[in-house]
C-alpha cells in the first residue's frame, strides 16, 4: 500500500467532512446529550465508507451517466433540510433549553436512526463531495485502495471524535443561547 496515497485520501477526506452541516450538527447534538452516540457515529461513518468506496471505484461514472439520480437526491434532500431547518429555527426561537445532566430525550432509537439516515443520504452535498469530487481526485491516483482507505479512516476518526468529544463542550451548552445558535 502506498502510504503517501493513503495520507492523501485521509487529508482529502478530512477537508471534505470538517464543515459543520446538518449531519455534523446532528452528531454533535447526540454527543452533547449522550444519547445513541455510538450508533449515530457508526451509521455516519459506515455510510461515508459506502459513498467513498462508490466514488473511488466508479459510482461517480454511473452518476455522471444518469444525472437524474443527483436531481432526485438533490430535491428530496433540499425538501428534508428545509423542513428540518424550519423546525430547528422555530425550536431555537421558542425554546430556553439548556443541557441537563442526563440530556433531553430525543426519541427512541428508531427515530434517531431514521433522522441520522436522512441527514446522511438525503444531503445533496454528500453525493457531490464524497462521490463525485472524491471519485474525481481518486481517478488521478494509481493506488485507489490506499486512497479510499485513507478517506474512510478520516470519516471514522471524525465522526467518533465529534460524537464522543462533544461532552467536552457540555459546559458551554448549559446555556440556552448556545443551543439556539446550534439550532440555527
Predicted regions and their residues:
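Juxtamembrane transmembrane-helix termini in multi-pass membrane transport proteins
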Residues: 3-71, 131-146
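Selective transmembrane alpha-helices of multi-pass membrane proteins
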Residues: 5, 65-97, 152-162, 170, ...
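Selected transmembrane alpha-helices and immediately adjacent juxtamembrane segments
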Residues: 109-130
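Flexible interhelical linker loops that connect adjacent transmembrane helices
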Residues: 94-113
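Short alpha-helical packing/oligomerization segments
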Residues: 141-157
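Alpha-helical transmembrane segments and their lipid-water interface positions
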Residues: 47-59, 81-85, 127, 158-166
Amino acid at each position: 500500500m502506498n502510504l503517501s496515497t493513503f495520507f492523501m485520501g485521509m487529508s482529502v477526506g478530512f477537508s471534505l467532512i470538517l464543515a459543520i452541516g446538518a449531519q455534523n450538527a446532528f452528531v454533535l447534538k447526540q454527543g452533547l446529550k449522550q444519547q445513541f452516540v455510538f450508533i449515530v457515529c457508526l451509521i455516519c461513518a459506515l455510510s461515508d465508507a459506502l459513498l467513498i468506496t462508490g466514488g473511488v471505484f466508479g459510482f461517480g461514472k454511473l452518476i455522471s451517466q444518469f444525472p437524474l439520480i443527483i436531481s432526485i437526491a438533490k430535491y428530496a434532500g433540499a425538501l428534508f433540510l428545509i423542513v428540518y431547518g424550519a423546525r430547528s429555527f422555530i425550536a431555537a426561537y421558542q425554546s430556553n433549553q439548556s443541557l441537563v445532566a442526563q440530556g433531553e430525550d430525543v426519541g427512541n432509537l428508531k427515530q434517531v436512526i431514521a433522522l441520522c439516515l436522512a441527514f446522511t443520504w438525503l444531503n445533496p452535498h454528500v453525493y457531490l463531495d464524497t462521490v463525485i469530487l472524491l471519485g474525481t481526485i481518486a481517478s488521478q491516483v494509481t493506488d485507489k485502495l490506499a486512497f479510499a482507505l485513507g478517506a474512510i479512516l478520516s470519516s471514522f476518526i471524525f465522526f467518533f471524535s465529534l460524537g464522543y468529544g462533544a461532552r467536552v463542550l457540555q459546559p458551554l451548552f448549559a446555556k440556552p443561547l448556545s443551543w439556539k445558535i446550534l439550532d440555527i
